[in-house]
Protein backbone atom coordinates (compact mmCIF):
# COMPACT_ATOMS: atom_id res chain seq x y z
CA UNK A 1 0.00 0.00 0.00
CA UNK A 2 1.22 3.54 -0.80
CA UNK A 3 0.64 6.54 1.48
CA UNK A 4 0.82 10.01 -0.12
CA UNK A 5 1.38 13.00 2.16
CA UNK A 6 0.92 16.76 2.14
CA UNK A 7 4.70 17.24 1.97
CA UNK A 8 5.00 15.54 -1.42
CA UNK A 9 6.31 12.29 0.03
CA UNK A 10 5.23 8.73 -0.69
CA UNK A 11 5.65 5.83 1.72
CA UNK A 12 5.20 2.30 0.37
CA UNK A 13 4.61 -0.42 2.95
CA UNK A 14 3.79 -4.12 2.73
CA UNK A 15 0.39 -4.81 4.24
CA UNK A 16 1.47 -7.91 6.12
CA UNK A 17 3.88 -5.72 8.11
CA UNK A 18 1.04 -3.59 9.46
CA UNK A 19 0.17 -4.19 13.14
CA UNK A 20 -2.80 -6.55 13.55
CA UNK A 21 -5.60 -5.80 15.98
CA UNK A 22 -9.14 -7.10 16.48
CA UNK A 23 -10.42 -3.88 17.99
CA UNK A 24 -9.46 -0.29 18.66
CA UNK A 25 -7.98 2.32 16.34
CA UNK A 26 -4.76 0.54 15.49
CA UNK A 27 -1.32 2.15 15.56
CA UNK A 28 -0.87 5.80 14.46
CA UNK A 29 0.61 5.91 10.96
CA UNK A 30 3.14 8.44 12.26
CA UNK A 31 4.71 5.61 14.26
CA UNK A 32 5.35 3.62 11.08
CA UNK A 33 7.16 6.37 9.17
CA UNK A 34 9.39 9.37 9.85
CA UNK A 35 6.95 12.21 9.20
CA UNK A 36 8.05 15.84 9.33
CA UNK A 37 6.20 18.30 11.57
CA UNK A 38 2.74 18.96 10.19
CA UNK A 39 2.98 16.22 7.55
CA UNK A 40 -0.34 14.45 6.96
CA UNK A 41 -1.55 11.56 4.84
CA UNK A 42 -3.79 12.96 2.10
CA UNK A 43 -4.40 9.77 0.12
CA UNK A 44 -3.54 6.09 -0.01
CA UNK A 45 -3.55 3.43 -2.72
CA UNK A 46 -3.60 -0.35 -2.65
CA UNK A 47 -0.97 -1.70 -5.04
CA UNK A 48 -2.69 -5.08 -5.32
CA UNK A 49 -2.88 -5.63 -9.13
CA UNK A 50 -6.51 -6.75 -8.89
CA UNK A 51 -7.46 -3.66 -6.90
CA UNK A 52 -5.66 -1.38 -9.36
CA UNK A 53 -7.55 -2.94 -12.25
CA UNK A 54 -10.91 -2.80 -10.46
CA UNK A 55 -11.69 0.72 -11.58
CA UNK A 56 -10.57 0.14 -15.17
CA UNK A 57 -11.95 -3.31 -16.03
CA UNK A 58 -15.39 -3.45 -17.69
CA UNK A 59 -17.98 -5.47 -15.77
CA UNK A 60 -18.35 -8.99 -17.12
CA UNK A 61 -21.71 -9.56 -15.45
CA UNK A 62 -20.24 -12.47 -13.45
CA UNK A 63 -21.05 -12.23 -9.76
CA UNK A 64 -18.30 -14.69 -8.81
CA UNK A 65 -15.66 -12.95 -6.69
CA UNK A 66 -13.05 -15.48 -7.81
CA UNK A 67 -13.89 -14.95 -11.49
CA UNK A 68 -13.90 -11.17 -11.08
CA UNK A 69 -10.50 -11.18 -9.37
CA UNK A 70 -9.03 -13.40 -12.10
CA UNK A 71 -10.35 -11.00 -14.74
CA UNK A 72 -8.78 -8.06 -12.92
CA UNK A 73 -5.45 -9.84 -12.49
CA UNK A 74 -5.41 -10.69 -16.20
CA UNK A 75 -6.16 -7.06 -17.07
CA UNK A 76 -3.43 -5.78 -14.74
CA UNK A 77 -0.90 -8.23 -16.16
CA UNK A 78 -1.72 -7.15 -19.73
CA UNK A 79 -1.25 -3.50 -18.74
CA UNK A 80 1.76 -3.94 -16.47
CA UNK A 81 3.71 -0.71 -16.25
CA UNK A 82 1.00 1.22 -18.08
CA UNK A 83 -1.06 2.44 -15.13
CA UNK A 84 -0.44 6.02 -14.05
CA UNK A 85 -1.18 8.27 -11.10
CA UNK A 86 -1.50 12.04 -10.81
CA UNK A 87 -0.50 14.39 -8.02
CA UNK A 88 -1.29 18.12 -7.80
CA UNK A 89 -0.27 20.81 -5.33
CA UNK A 90 -2.22 23.76 -3.99
CA UNK A 91 -0.31 26.05 -6.35
CA UNK A 92 -1.90 24.38 -9.37
CA UNK A 93 1.25 22.54 -10.48
CA UNK A 94 1.14 18.79 -10.98
CA UNK A 95 2.16 15.81 -13.06
CA UNK A 96 1.48 12.21 -14.03
CA UNK A 97 3.81 9.37 -13.06
CA UNK A 98 3.94 5.61 -13.74
CA UNK A 99 2.73 3.48 -10.84
CA UNK A 100 5.65 1.17 -11.53
CA UNK A 101 7.72 3.83 -9.71
CA UNK A 102 5.99 2.95 -6.44
CA UNK A 103 8.34 0.44 -4.87
CA UNK A 104 8.79 -0.32 -1.18
CA UNK A 105 10.47 2.52 0.72
CA UNK A 106 12.24 2.90 4.04
CA UNK A 107 10.57 4.61 7.01
CA UNK A 108 11.89 7.91 5.60
CA UNK A 109 9.83 7.52 2.43
CA UNK A 110 10.68 8.99 -0.96
CA UNK A 111 10.25 12.48 -2.37
CA UNK A 112 7.58 12.43 -5.08
CA UNK A 113 6.70 16.10 -5.58
CA UNK A 114 8.89 19.17 -5.13
CA UNK A 115 7.04 21.96 -3.32
CA UNK A 116 7.93 25.63 -2.95
CA UNK A 117 7.36 27.71 0.16
CA UNK A 118 4.21 26.76 2.07
CA UNK A 119 2.69 24.83 -0.83
CA UNK A 120 1.16 21.45 0.02
CA UNK A 121 -0.10 18.52 -2.00
CA UNK A 122 -3.87 18.70 -2.49
CA UNK A 123 -4.37 15.15 -3.62
CA UNK A 124 -3.44 12.03 -5.54
CA UNK A 125 -5.60 10.14 -8.04
CA UNK A 126 -5.28 7.02 -10.11
CA UNK A 127 -5.81 7.99 -13.75
CA UNK A 128 -9.07 6.37 -14.83
CA UNK A 129 -10.29 8.90 -17.41
CA UNK A 130 -9.09 11.24 -20.15
CA UNK A 131 -10.21 14.59 -18.69
CA UNK A 132 -9.07 16.48 -15.60
CA UNK A 133 -11.37 18.86 -13.71
CA UNK A 134 -9.86 21.32 -11.23
CA UNK A 135 -11.51 23.91 -9.00
CA UNK A 136 -9.95 26.80 -7.08
CA UNK A 137 -11.21 27.82 -3.66
CA UNK A 138 -12.37 31.18 -5.04
CA UNK A 139 -14.90 29.54 -7.34
CA UNK A 140 -13.23 28.91 -10.70
CA UNK A 141 -13.15 25.61 -12.56
CA UNK A 142 -11.33 24.24 -15.59
CA UNK A 143 -11.33 21.01 -17.62
CA UNK A 144 -8.23 19.97 -19.56
CA UNK A 145 -7.18 16.79 -21.40
CA UNK A 146 -5.21 14.43 -19.16
CA UNK A 147 -2.57 13.98 -21.87
CA UNK A 148 -1.61 17.66 -21.43
CA UNK A 149 -0.36 16.87 -17.92
CA UNK A 150 3.41 16.27 -17.94
CA UNK A 151 4.62 12.72 -17.31
CA UNK A 152 7.58 12.55 -14.90
CA UNK A 153 9.60 9.52 -13.92
CA UNK A 154 11.29 11.23 -10.98
CA UNK A 155 10.54 13.89 -8.38
CA UNK A 156 9.58 17.34 -9.65
CA UNK A 157 6.98 20.12 -9.70
CA UNK A 158 5.44 19.25 -13.03
CA UNK A 159 3.67 21.87 -15.13
CA UNK A 160 1.15 24.58 -14.28
CA UNK A 161 -2.25 23.04 -14.84
CA UNK A 162 -4.41 25.95 -13.65
CA UNK A 163 -3.50 29.61 -13.17
CA UNK A 164 -4.39 30.71 -9.65
CA UNK A 165 -4.64 34.37 -8.64
CA UNK A 166 -5.04 35.09 -4.92
CA UNK A 167 -6.38 31.58 -4.45
CA UNK A 168 -5.34 27.95 -4.13
CA UNK A 169 -6.52 24.66 -5.58
CA UNK A 170 -9.48 23.22 -3.68
CA UNK A 171 -9.36 19.84 -5.39
CA UNK A 172 -9.55 17.90 -8.64
CA UNK A 173 -11.14 14.87 -10.26
CA UNK A 174 -10.25 12.69 -13.23
CA UNK A 175 -13.02 11.20 -15.37
CA UNK A 176 -14.25 10.95 -18.94
CA UNK A 177 -15.93 13.91 -20.67
CA UNK A 178 -19.39 12.75 -19.59
CA UNK A 179 -18.28 12.52 -15.97
CA UNK A 180 -19.20 14.77 -13.10
CA UNK A 181 -17.85 16.14 -9.84
CA UNK A 182 -19.40 17.19 -6.54
CA UNK A 183 -18.26 20.46 -4.99
CA UNK A 184 -18.45 21.14 -1.27
CA UNK A 185 -18.69 24.75 -0.08
CA UNK A 186 -17.73 26.49 3.13
CA UNK A 187 -21.37 26.36 4.26
CA UNK A 188 -21.22 22.54 3.83
CA UNK A 189 -23.70 22.57 0.97
CA UNK A 190 -22.85 20.67 -2.22
CA UNK A 191 -23.28 21.16 -5.96
CA UNK A 192 -22.93 18.74 -8.88
CA UNK A 193 -20.81 19.85 -11.83
CA UNK A 194 -20.99 18.04 -15.19
CA UNK A 195 -17.73 18.02 -17.14
CA UNK A 196 -19.60 18.44 -20.43
CA UNK A 197 -20.92 21.82 -19.24
CA UNK A 198 -17.37 23.22 -19.09
CA UNK A 199 -15.50 23.81 -22.34
CA UNK A 200 -12.27 21.83 -22.57
CA UNK A 201 -9.26 24.16 -22.74
CA UNK A 202 -5.49 23.91 -22.65
CA UNK A 203 -3.63 23.64 -19.37
CA UNK A 204 -2.57 26.79 -17.54
CA UNK A 205 -5.76 28.81 -17.89
CA UNK A 206 -7.78 30.43 -15.08
CA UNK A 207 -10.96 28.56 -15.92
CA UNK A 208 -14.53 29.83 -15.65
CA UNK A 209 -16.64 30.93 -12.70
CA UNK A 210 -18.54 27.98 -11.22
CA UNK A 211 -19.34 29.60 -7.85
CA UNK A 212 -19.79 33.35 -7.47
CA UNK A 213 -20.31 33.78 -3.75
CA UNK A 214 -19.33 30.59 -1.98
CA UNK A 215 -15.84 29.32 -1.25
CA UNK A 216 -15.10 25.80 -2.51
CA UNK A 217 -13.55 23.58 0.15
CA UNK A 218 -13.52 20.15 -1.51
CA UNK A 219 -13.92 18.39 -4.86
CA UNK A 220 -15.12 14.79 -5.18
Model-derived regions: residue spans:
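Short, structured "edge-of-domain" segments at secondary-structure transitions
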Residues: 1-220
Amino acid sequence: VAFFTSRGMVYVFKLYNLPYTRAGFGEPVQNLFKFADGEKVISMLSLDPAELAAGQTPSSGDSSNKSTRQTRLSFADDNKGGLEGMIIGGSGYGFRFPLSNLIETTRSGRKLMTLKGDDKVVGFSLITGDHLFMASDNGKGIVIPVDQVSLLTGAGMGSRLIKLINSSLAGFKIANKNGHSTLTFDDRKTKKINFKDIRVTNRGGQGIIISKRKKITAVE
